[in-house]
Design a protein with these regions (language model features):
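Extracytoplasmic/periplasmic solute-binding protein
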Residues: 166-174, 179, 204-253, 298
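Hinge/lid segment of periplasmic solute-binding proteins
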Residues: 124-179, 320-322
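Extracytoplasmic/periplasmic substrate-recognition and gating elements
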Residues: 85, 167, 189-191, 274, ...
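Glycine-centered hinge/linker elements that transmit conformational signals in sensory
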Residues: 207, 250-281
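Conserved N-terminal structural module of periplasmic/extracytoplasmic solute-binding proteins
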Residues: 2-130, 328-329, 369, 443-454
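Long, aromatic- and glycine/proline-rich binding clefts that accommodate carbohydrate-like moieties
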Residues: 151-154, 322, 372-421, 429
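Short, solvent-exposed loop/beta-turn-alpha elements that line the ligand-binding surface or hinge
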Residues: 137-153, 222, 239-263, 313-314, ...
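Conserved C-terminal helix/tail region of periplasmic/extracytoplasmic solute-binding proteins
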Residues: 189, 403-454
Length: 454
């Protein structure tokens, strides 16, 4: 979720800093808009759902094309280089559109007469329903992709009714974003915080102490939806990761307009009234909030891995990261979307080789490349090597905990194409006291159902 990206090299432990996801946290990964497919004939059913597949690439030269957003080029090119080193008979050429149009262009690219062999997909339900993607079930069986964490597999599946999280597999991601609390270690020490809070009660005690000490408890740029993050944190805790994901995935009769959700959103309103966010949060954007946090103006900053490089550079050892505390008796959960959710277009010529690339994304080599790029890696395995003590190292450890807890949750803003605007505006009104938790949730649910035609 960003408008500035990604690494320029893959150094692991040197002082070189990767330009990872920038502070404008709501552009690239929230681009869910999807234009109608363009020209090109619909693929045959046998192309869209192959059954005769192979995991062998042979020795003959194979040429593939990969399609993604330009901001992810450095990560992709590093993955391509690692794959080509392992499979020297395969050559992959990257093709990139500007980030702000890749989502709109993607359906036309997928439907063209000469589609790429590998393509990043955002609006999975739409393009799978249009028959533009290869059903990967046969490859999933061949490569044992069912061994992937269930929370990740859910992000790759869609059923015949367009409900995500179940049905056939159509994608496999190279890595993920991960969200949580950054904290200023020096300010934390002033409050007696020596380790991250383990419970919501401990977190709220720290917020109260910070406010009493004259600190800003949570820095947030709510002009660009910063408080939507803590709003979803409370919803994740109140409803559970599975229920929130079902809502984002369009499960039948799913609703977020419940008494439990209203109570959760009410806590966010209470925090605003208590002064736990900046007074000017609704007039502050994500980039400004990042800079103010880095300038020691707040104890906490809820954001994601896209801000790690900037904070590491500006704050050094003074910044830490932790996942949101879970309710008693529950597993940790937080927002974590795919970086590049790769599919194989139905009209692709080299499906077996493309599937081999998708499978490669689970390898230790690929996981290291993705971690070097500032993302959390796909699948499970050893935590990739990172600079000891860096905030990226803390993020990688936190993501490993999240995967073990099966706590990856989709961003609620991405449930439909138009919901980012609704969430942002309604949470701004909540902070201003211009709406209630109940009215906020009703407005969001109306927009959700309107876009889904329910």
């Amino acid at each position: 979720m960003t408008d500035r990206l990604v690494p320029q090299d893959s150094a692991r432990t040197t002082g070189t800093r990767l330009r990872v996801l920038g502070a404008g946290a709501c552009a690239l990964f929230a681009l869910a808009a999807c234009a109608p497919p363009g020209g090109g004939s619909a693929p045959a059913a046998s192309e869209a759902a192959p059954t005769d597949v192979s995991t062998e690439l042979g020795e003959e030269p194979v040429e593939l094309t990969l399609y993604d957003g330009a901001g992810l080029k450095a990560k992709d090119e590093a993955l391509i280089a690692a794959f080509e080193e392992k499979y020297p008979n395969v050559t992959i050429t990257g093709r990139y559109d500007p980030d702000d149009v890749q989502a709109q262009n993607s359906p036309r690219v997928l439907a063209s007469d000469d589609p790429p062999d590998i393509a990043r997909v955002i609006a999975l339900s739409d393009v799978a329903g249009d028959g533009l993607l290869t059903n990967l079930d046969a490859y999933a069986d061949a490569y044992n992709w069912d061994e992937l964490p269930e929370g990740q597999l859910a992000q790759y599946r869609v059923n015949e009714d367009g409900v995500r999280g179940e049905g056939s597999q159509y994608t496999l991601a190279d890595g993920f974003t991960v969200t949580g609390f950054y904290y200023n270690k020096e300010l934390a020490q002033q409050l007696g915080m020596t380790t991250p809070p383990q419970t919501m009660d401990e977190l709220q005690d720290l917020l109260a102490q910070a406010e009493e000490a004259g600190m800003v408890p949570i820095m947030a740029g709510n002009q660009t939806g910063g408080i939507v993050f803590t709003t979803q944190m409370m919803l994740n805790n109140a409803l559970g990761a599975e229920a929130v994901n079902e809502w984002v995935f369009h499960a039948p009769e799913a609703t977020i307009d419940t008494p439990e959700a209203a109570e959760a959103v009410g806590t966010v309103q209470d925090w605003a009234e208590a002064g736990y966010y900046p007074e000017d949060t609704n007039g502050t954007d994500a980039t400004t909030a990042l800079g103010r946090f880095a300038n020691d103006e707040a104890l906490f900053f809820f954001s994601g891995n896209w801000d790690a490089a900037a904070l590491d550079e500006q704050m050094g050892d003074n910044v830490g990261f932790f996942l949101p505390p879970a309710p008693e008796g529950s597993e940790q959960a937080t927002m974590s979307d795919p970086a590049s959710n790769f599919a194989i277009p139905a009209g692709a010529d080299e499906k077996d080789a493309a599937a081999a690339f998708l499978n490669f994304l689970r390898s230790e080599e690929a996981r290291q490349v993705v971690a070097d790029a500032g993302f959390a890696p796909s699948g499970e395995g050893e935590i990739p090597t990172t600079e000891e003590g860096s905030v990226n190292a803390q993020i990688q450890e936190a993501f490993a905990q999240l995967v073990e807890a099966d706590g990856q949750v989709q961003f609620v803003q991405n449930a439909t194409n138009g919901l980012t605007t609704t969430w942002n505006s309604e949470v701004q009104r909540l902070v201003d006291g211009a709406t209630s938790p109940e009215d906020l949730l009703a407005a969001v649910q109306r927009q959700y159902e309107s876009e889904l035609g329910r």
